[in-house]
């Protein structure tokens, strides 16, 4: 349901070469392909009115985000996301042209995070500022820890977004985030 949940989409695959235009890459086999900062084909980006961002699918408000390429979740991950929240700062994932939720249905979210100082985060699924479901967590500890929560939608929505907000501000390192419906079969 989340796009770029491991924050690696804008990291060029090994052996690929970024062209000067910032859009195309040369693959290891010599083919020229579109990369668009990890968004994929430019026609998909333009056709779906995807706003530009340095880390695909992730947007901030009163916060700074940057890729962390050394302090990752484990040796199988190429990146983590370092967040510096100001007071009332937020981080939003747009999903694949929105996140679809159904009233009364539950969704399992888990994330790996760590923080030098304890930080409170509010996790919500919302549409145009209206919270459809949410929960809170406290992140602490200098090792990645898994945090799990259930989110149950209050109403149907096909264009929701996941937002992680921080009332007090602070820094957190996110290693991976997953959001999946509990009911995956008809």
How would you name each of these model-derived features?
Residues 1-186:
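Extracellular and organelle-lumenal recognition/adhesion modules and their flexible linkers in secreted
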